[in-house]
């Protein structure tokens, strides 16, 4: 039976629906650190979508062992550079950064994003963090990284995108030693993820500007004579007479899109270094050619082409590890119709 009461289809969980503060998505939590020391996140730029033919390796699936077509998102992932090591302390109000150590040699393009600290900060900063760890004042060690979009032909910008990444290690000492070893160096996507692993993706969605309540909230069109009185695509009422104010729950027009969205447990089907393996004839629409390292993610990822996409170790990991997928074919047919 159809639902009689249906004021809107949109979820109030995402309110307020306003523009994201930055095009760089944020991860506010990190999974528990296990295994060998490594970064817990990476970043790339969305290229577009295609499809692959692979063997279905999902247990108890109706098509298990059969060849299936799977849509995939292509993300170009050039190496990122570790700019700084950051130490956190925790008190009753939460975590706070108490010390940083910046690398001595950084790319000149980083000046376009932030003021670069003095070159002599590295040794002094690392020594300071080491003392804080010995005193027991440090709760976590993280790395500040930035991308190098100047190496991409499909992304028309030179300014790096700077972000923070957690470090996976068994204790603070191991985290600090690993952070010191990669400070100022390049990190490749193969140093963080491998084929078949599951990741969380975060991105800023496609911005659609100001939209009406029908498109923004999925309300019904007005019926009968109401639709002929100039209010076809409007809500029937702003609410009750009392209380004498408009509730934030009322579906109204406003900003749609350009919101941060995080999707959990997206499987990496392939990590490659030769972009020609996935570039279709004529290149990807609104992007062009993939020339370097890339990642194939099963399914869709938020955001338009050229948008920054962040990948993180899964915070709600599935128990079963499916292993490396068996990909038989990657479609390189033209996407231009």
From Swiss-Prot:
Keywords: Ribonucleoprotein, Ribosomal protein, RNA-binding, rRNA-binding. Gene3D superfamilies: 3.30.1430.10, Ribosomal protein L3, domain 3, Translation factors. Pfam families: Ribosomal_L3. SUPFAM superfamilies: Translation proteins. InterPro entries: L3_arc_euk (IPR045077), Ribosomal_L3_dom_3_arc_sf (IPR044892), Ribosomal_uL3 (IPR000597), Ribosomal_uL3_arc (IPR019928), Ribosomal_uL3_CS (IPR019926), Transl_B-barrel_sf (IPR009000). Residues 1-20 are annotated as: Disordered. One of its GO terms (cellular component) is cytosolic large ribosomal subunit. GO terms for molecular function: rRNA binding; structural constituent of ribosome. It comes from the Archaea. One of its GO terms (biological process) is translation. Part of the 50S ribosomal subunit. Forms a cluster with proteins L14 and L24e. Belongs to the universal ribosomal protein uL3 family. HAMAP family: Ribosomal_uL3_A. One of the primary rRNA binding proteins, it binds directly near the 3'-end of the 23S rRNA, where it nucleates assembly of the 50S subunit. This is Large ribosomal subunit protein uL3. It comes from Methanosarcina mazei (strain ATCC BAA-159 / DSM 3647 / Goe1 / Go1 / JCM 11833 / OCM 88). The gene is rpl3.
